[in-house]
């Protein structure tokens, strides 16, 4: 079955690699145009383009899909299946309708939950116990197509969005390869999504970073984990602002107001939270410095307990 693959970041690269390792006939790849990256702002390939070039697969990078040229190009490639994974752009229906067996997409949630951007991060931010990946047929509405495969996984209590991203990247790639085989054999089953259960997410931004110490310890831990590796949780304690990469629960109860320092030492920085509880900050990063343990940070930035 002739497959045209569309994707850009490393999440998509692993899916492309899985198809190639499974022996699928990927005849062409579409990826976003090269963009300047790094301090020197040099143009660099996307992970998907790099893999395609390594394997000798033709790569196309249309700047626009509005003029119909990309759709005509796809028709000349005559794909039987279009696979889209984190391409990074909404595609016109005429483009999605070209492939004989349709267009499918890998999404980082158990649809219809968390349609849209950053589903992996929001699963962590919201404190979900489980999440997963879905393979869907692409529809006109965002992430609203029939689901043809899904796989669930537990979220670790202190698992970061970055760590979960890496796991779902692999899980999604494996599920995609299995699903493509089923499409080829005609054994795939389409399950319409229940619109009543649909939820939507939004992009993350730096305005979300500050920790709200009025929240419960678990909500704050999930805030820290969900914003790691970007945009990263931040706070200001004892007049010092820093990024927070790690924290742990304590059994302590406190009468101090949320955001007050209970203790600061070798174990970390214990801070009062909502509900008379607390948590301990264990890993931080000061401006212009490397990530370090809270204990190491305190050597250069000693803090006084408020109670």
Task: Name each region found by the language model.
Residues 1-40:
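N-terminal Rossmann-like dinucleotide-binding module
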Residues 214-307:
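An anion-binding loop in the catalytic cleft
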